[in-house]
């Protein structure tokens, strides 16, 4: 069976003819003091055949009058119970509120619909377990400045509460409330707004922070320059270009921004300022880019700004490249379409001097550097460990290794380096079987390069081979020594020749 309300909802939207007052009252569609009620669609009602009200306004008025029957009817027609509660609060109709108390999940949900501070506070009081802090927090959430104004004097000395409300307003980006708090209370940490602005990426909030900070400067001694520098560093680090520009309005150094932009590869910021930056600063930025291991695009931007002219900082650049083991700038200079700048040899020298075997091998692979070039430099710098490790890695066969090391000696002019290589070759032969040809070739090699001690050692080793062939070898070595005035080699060769001759005489 249909209820009366269901019949009304179904049939009395647009009756064929006006119903009399008695009929409307019997149907429960008469609102005392207002007239008949008729539903108009889903959101409106018609009162007394004349006035059209929103259904929520109607239910609010009915609740304020304490008219339980009309409230019930309007709820069936789709009215919002929250507006009924608001109306009941306006005229303190608490009995009506008690009827619907169980249908309200959280009284706080109603607060956003209220603009009257008195009603707002009454509604909040329905949450019997809530505190004043909760009231203030919701007031901030709903932009109810009037609530804060009411308790302004009470909170003036509560530093903790003021700070909490200020930061909450900042997080909610409620600019009116933020401004009111900053202007009416003493906020201990006024700078908290900047941290929140960075997190929210809210430039308006950021600008407000500077306005408050400048106001505070008139009554407090603060290091404004230090604050701006800190902001510039962070904004540039995060690539917040608009924040950088905003901070620079109040002072600060562009250099601070540039060094952070290079370090964190924010080319938009870098490109904006680079063309007005002094050359000396750009050179420092390039060195910083190496230290920070900047990206290829960042490095190219700096190099192009210098027009690839780096002669004034070559030593510093090489030092930075080797120290930080970051070779990108060397590669970019080498890849330049015109007027390539080859710093590979210069870097190699410094790497061999200061770096490990693994780092040098990596450099060799990256720039296609031959092992011979590396070994030459290592010999000049007396890096025995590198000579051993690299030659062993490249030429695993010992005879092959000796062959290549001998070729390097032939092409070297550095005397101490040659000697070091020749000693290294001799050390390899100590653990290697050599046939007569290989042994004689190495002996002659030492004679050619005036390595007296090694020549003598090889001569002694060669006595296990045919003495006639050895005497012929010594004659050749003597001829070489006389030709180049290698006195000690000549004396040693003569001595061994006489020794062989004496052996033959004794055998006769």
Swiss-Prot record:
Q: Which Pfam families match?
A: DUF249 (PF03158)
What does the UniProt induction comment state? Expressed in the early phase of the viral replicative cycle.
Per UniProt, the keywords (alphabetical) are: ANK repeat, Early protein, Repeat
Organism superkingdom: Viruses
Read off the InterPro entries from this record.
Ankyrin_rpt-contain_sf, MGF_505
Q: Which stretches are ANK repeats?
A: 54-83, 253-282, 313-343
Keyword field contains Repeat? yes
Task: Please give the family membership noted in the entry.
Answer: Belongs to the asfivirus MGF 505 family.
Q: What does this protein do?
A: Plays a role in virus cell tropism, and may be required for efficient virus replication in macrophages.
UniProt protein name: Protein MGF 505-9R
